[in-house]
UniProtKB/Swiss-Prot annotation:
GO terms for biological process: signal transduction; visual perception. This is Guanine nucleotide-binding protein subunit beta-2. SUPFAM superfamilies: WD40 repeat-like (SSF50978). It comes from the Eukaryota. It holds the Pfam family WD40_Gbeta. Guanine nucleotide-binding proteins (G proteins) are involved as modulators or transducers in various transmembrane signaling systems. The beta and gamma chains are required for the GTPase activity, for replacement of GDP by GTP, and for G protein-effector interaction. The keyword RNA-binding does not apply. Belongs to the WD repeat G protein beta family. PANTHER family: GUANINE NUCLEOTIDE-BINDING PROTEIN BETA G PROTEIN BETA. It comes from Calliphora vicina. Keywords: Repeat, Sensory transduction, Transducer, Vision, WD repeat.
Amino acid sequence: MPKVDPETQKLYDEINGLIKKFQDDHKAKADCTMQEKCGDMSDIPKIRLSSKKILKGHINKVNSVHFAGDSRHCVTGSLDGKLIIWDTWTANKVQVIPLRSAWVMTVAFSPSGNFVACGGMDNQCTVYDVNNRDASGVAKMTRELLGYEGFLSSCRFLDDTHLITGSGDMKICHWDLEKGVKTMDFNGHAGDIAGLSLSPDMNTYITGSVDKTAKLWDVREETHKQMFFGHEMDVNSVCYHPSGNGFASASEDQTARLYDIRADQQIALYEPPQKNTGFTSCALSTSGRYLLCSGIEGNIHSFDTMKVCHNGMLQGHENRITCISLSPNGMCLASTSWDQQVRLWL
């Protein structure tokens, strides 16, 4: 490793000291634990989801999945260079969209179901109108959003005309899709953006990063409002609590965590029975009681958020699970994997 000069090392030490003081101050304000407050609550049933359908069509690793607002359709992106829009009720393909670059890492469905977006190692975000087709019969490309200096890791629609993206250049961008212009840059992370989750009211969002932190942002302001520490490795995924008052995170450090935004700190930590897997993605049930986390070993772990205990495991994938997405109505969980499969859990 290159030698660090004394002045730079002094700055590093000063920053780390401030971070530790910040964390210690937060811990001192935690007057109780989740287990103490929720210990007398009734246990919830073991998770009983099973893999009812396997969506087959991709011929390479599937990296991302996201549901439309109707809870029926989902879109998946794979290294085979295709987006596939699925009807999850019938397990049929609705559309297949060939991509210019096969290195797709993230996909998003607009809440209305009218548009899908994707991006990855091509350092751009591409938006398609699923209701309009070009001369070849493929969904019409409406926007190519350029200007990234790193891979695109996450994207989410605020509505049909606005999109938020996170990328490997440590930036979050707000786009006006009607004009095709970037309206705002959000800067604050010190590492690649890895995950992004919108609040239920669409006014704020959470990001997770390789810098081991999660941050809260207001869509109208360029600087973050809160920063959350705790993880010891990359924060791969974040998911807003249905109440809008907290969020869950999943990390390479083999833990998931629950944060309370109002208390400005972590309130629970979740670990698998055997610490043999980092977590790649997370989702909260519509009640907020179940936390689901996908692992690099190919299983989906379920946790009781209130009792802070492992609640079960969903098995079926044969390789690393890359992404999970819960339908807005909470009735179906979709998962994607390096085993080229998309599974629906009901």
